[in-house]
Amino acid sequence: MVSPAKPVVCIVTPGTKSANNGNWRTAARWAEMLRDRFKVIVQSEWDGTHCDAMIALHARRSATSIARFAANRASPALAVVLTGTDLYRDLPRHLEVPRSLDAARRIVVLQEEALRSLQARWRRKARVVLQSATPLRTVRKTRIALHCVAVGHLRPEKDPRTLFAAMRLIPHELPITLRHIGAPLDAALARQAKALAKQDSRYRYSGALSHGLTRAAIQSAHLLVHPSAIEGGANVISEAVMSGTAIVASRIAGNIGLLGRSYPGYFEAGDASGLARRLVQAWKDVNYRKRLQKACTARKAALSPAGERRALRNLLAEMLS
């Protein structure tokens, strides 16, 4: 007996494997999760290949593929995934974003708080897919220093300037270090990172690393520091949680939607002194570190691969029914 052909799903992402950015890693992870039930194609722009459903990451940058797929289809099996720049910058500025949302059968957001940014007509067809990470064992960490890691390409949305300023505010006698991982996409920010590394041995700029090396760095750190100004729902948050690494993060919707409103590790976005205080507190107060760790551990079930896979399958079942 011949098995029925698997439905074909095209995942469109403006990211590329060589760029090693969040869009690409999301697309690659989702493709792997879906391949047991679907034939999955990943493209940077849809080339017209037959597909039964499309999942398009980035409403603005994938707008051409979205419009072409939706054309001449009364009810396309089309899901548009909203990134942080879509939600918190481009939605009110670029007509392509609302057009993409209107064309979609389903809208995907990557954390619960994002629903608040959608008009009622879009919220009705929105679904939340929390990004996951493979669990890693928690490793023993030194007690004689506080080693922090920040992961994010150097660009304004990730707000590395707040990191730089915070490190300058932390007293030099405190054994607090920061390793910064991310490609130098913004030349001015890259110059600042390299200058700080020369001036302050506690700060180390590693540039872009492979995903495996980045996860190892997160796993070995005491804290992930995540100062973004705009975030749709950063997968690095999930990677830290699933590695047993606590988090200090900016109080923005993209982080609150993953960690919860009562998470004890927030500082106000752009507040370097607030970040510095959090890091000093984490070094000096072992009970505070335990509170952070407990709060992160409580998020493991929500950020597990099983939950993400289930949400994706439910999404496609709705569109293809």
Model-derived regions, located:
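Aromatic "clamp/platform" in nucleotide-sugar-dependent glycosyltransferases that forms part
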Residues: 229
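Conserved donor-binding/catalytic core segment of Leloir-type glycosyltransferases
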Residues: 140-158, 163-169, 178-181
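A short, active-site helix/loop in glycosyltransferases that binds the activated sugar's phosphate group
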Residues: 102-126, 133-136
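Conserved acidic donor-binding segment of nucleotide-sugar-dependent glycosyltransferases
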Residues: 261-272, 281-286
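Nucleotide-activated donor-binding/catalytic signature segment of Leloir-type glycosyltransferases, i.e.
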Residues: 191-209
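Short alpha-helical donor nucleotide-sugar binding micro-motif in glycosyltransferases
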Residues: 101, 208-209, 216-221
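Short hydrophobic beta-strand element within catalytic cores of glycosyltransferases
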Residues: 246-249
